[in-house]
Design a protein with these regions (language model features):
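Conserved alpha-helical segments that form or flank metal/cofactor-binding pockets of metalloenzymes
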Residues: 36-73, 140-143
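Alpha-helical scaffold segments that form or flank carboxylate-/histidine-based iron centers
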Residues: 3-14, 33-53, 92-96, 121-135
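A structural signal for well-ordered alpha-helices, especially hydrophobic packing surfaces
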Residues: 19, 26, 52, 59, ...
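Preference for long, well-ordered alpha-helical segments
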Residues: 95, 99-147
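Short, functional N-terminal and low-complexity linear motifs
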Residues: 20-25, 46-49, 72-80
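Alpha-helical bundle segments that constitute or directly flank the non-heme di-iron/ferroxidase center
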Residues: 2-32, 94-117
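Carboxylate-rich helix-loop segments that flank metal/cofactor sites and access channels
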Residues: 57-97, 101-107
Length: 147
C-alpha cells in the first residue's frame, strides 16, 4: 500500500468523523442556546464532506483503493468521540470544547500525513486541506472564547 493510499484512508476516516461531529453539534446548537453558531458548524460539516470526496476521487484517479469505510487505526483514534457525549447535554461551551478536541485531532492527522512520502499532487491537496482545517479549528476556538 502506498503512502498516499494509507494517508488517504486515515484522512477520509477523520474527515467523516468531523463531518458527523460538526453536523451533530450544529443540530444541538440550532435547538439550544446558540442557534447562530449552527450555520458555522453546518458549513464546516459540509467542508469535511467535500474534503473527503476530494481525497477519495484523487485516490481513485491514482489507482489507489481508498476504502471508504476507513481504517482500524483511525477508528481507534476518533477525535470526535467526545462530541458524541457532549451533544447529549445542553451546554454550548461543552459542545464547542468537544469540537475543538476533534479539530485538534484532525490537525494532528493532517500533520502525520504530511510527514509521509506523498506524491506531489496528493501532498498539494493535503497541504491545502490542512490549512483549511487549522483555520476551522481557530474559528471554533474563537466561538468558544465568546461563550
Amino acid at each position: 500500500m502506498s503512502d498516499d493510499e494509507k494517508a488517504a484512508k486515515e484522512l477520509v476516516e477523520t474527515l467523516r468523523d468531523g463531518e458527523k461531529g460538526f453536523a451533530a453539534a450544529a443540530e444541538k446548537l440550532r435547538d439550544g442556546d446558540r442557534p447562530e453558531w449552527a450555520s458555522t458548524l453546518q458549513r464546516l460539516s459540509e467542508q469535511r464532506a467535500q474534503f473527503s470526496r476530494e481525497i477519495i476521487d484523487l485516490g481513485h484517479a491514482y489507482g489507489d483503493d481508498v476504502d471508504e469505510s476507513g481504517t482500524a487505526t483511525a477508528a481507534m483514534h476518533r477525535g470526535w468521540i467526545a462530541l458524541k457525549d457532549a451533544v447529549t447535554g445542553d451546554d454550548a461551551g461543552a459542545v464547542l470544547g468537544a469540537a475543538v478536541t476533534g479539530e485538534d485531532h484532525a490537525v494532528s492527522e493532517y500533520e502525520k500525513a504530511l510527514e509521509k512520502d506523498l506524491s506531489a499532487g496528493f501532498r498539494e491537496v493535503v497541504s491545502r486541506q490542512h490549512q483549511a482545517v487549522v483555520a476551522a479549528r481557530d474559528e471554533v476556538k474563537a466561538l468558544q472564547s465568546v461563550d
